């Protein structure tokens, strides 16, 4: 069975929430079991915490830091992972948000510590998690998007009108059907000979928009000229089409 890119993004987000969440729980447990930090050689880090507010009260050992790590990055990410496993939409949203939370957490470390590999790596992990969450959310929205021609009962009732459109993901198709339904026009979809589907299709088609190149299309088999010229009706056009296949507008 072919997996959608929405499912792949969701699975990657699940990995990141589990990776960050379990790692945070392990780190918090180490801090709470040995607040002095000597067992893992973390006691040398305590002087850096003294630049933070209320350091003389809450940062004399790792007790407060352990609870903060558990609540901010541990339980939150594991909650998002649980929602993702249950296929709840909130899991995608929270997974992305908690990636941003991790980045903010690391920004505090950038303020406290000299530049180091661990903080930089986890900042990048947070950025990737946030980006993955956003991608999973967008892909899920795209996957759920539907245009059912049966919902537009008035399309084709006025053969004097015609709506012509090009749509890569279906959004312009919805606009075209709505316009045709309002006017009773017939409808015709222009198809490209280039790859347009999926993420690769997005980047492939983007070249044409960036360079303003004409995109090659499948030859038009609908008698557009005859219909428009004879009926003298305005042609509604949605999307882009090749300059070599321009349709007359009256």
Residues of each region from the PLM?
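Active-site-proximal alpha-helix that buttresses catalytic centers in soluble enzyme cores
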Residues: 131-250
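Topology signature of small-to-medium multi-pass alpha-helical membrane proteins
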Residues: 2-155, 177, 229, 243-250
């Amino acid at each position: 069975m072919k997996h959608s890119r929405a499912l792949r993004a969701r699975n990657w987000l699940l990995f990141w929430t589990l990776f960050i969440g379990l790692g945070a729980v392990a780190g918090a447990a180490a801090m709470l079991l040995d607040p002095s930090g000597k067992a893992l050689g973390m006691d040398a880090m305590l002087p850096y915490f003294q630049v933070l507010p209320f350091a003389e009260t809450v940062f004399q050992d790792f007790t407060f830091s352990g609870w903060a790590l558990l609540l901010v990055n541990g339980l939150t990410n594991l909650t998002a992972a649980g929602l993702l496993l249950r296929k709840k939409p909130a899991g995608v949203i929270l997974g992305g948000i908690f990636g941003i939370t991790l980045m903010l957490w690391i920004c505090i470390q950038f303020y406290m510590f000299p530049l180091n590999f661990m903080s930089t790596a986890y900042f990048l992990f947070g950025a990737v998690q946030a980006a993955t969450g956003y991608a999973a959310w967008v892909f899920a929205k795209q996957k759920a998007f539907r245009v059912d021609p049966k919902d537009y009962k008035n399309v084709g009732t006025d053969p004097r009108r015609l709506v012509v459109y090009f749509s890569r993901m279906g959004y312009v198709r919805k606009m075209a059907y709505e316009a045709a339904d309002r006017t009773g026009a017939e409808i015709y979809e222009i198809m490209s000979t280039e790859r347009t589907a999926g993420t690769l299709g997005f980047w492939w088609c983007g070249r044409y928009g960036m360079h303003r190149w004409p995109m090659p299309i499948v030859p038009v088999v609908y008698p557009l000229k005859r219909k428009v010229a004879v009926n003298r009706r305005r042609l509604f056009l949605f999307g882009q089409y090749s300059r070599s296949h321009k349709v007359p507008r009256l």
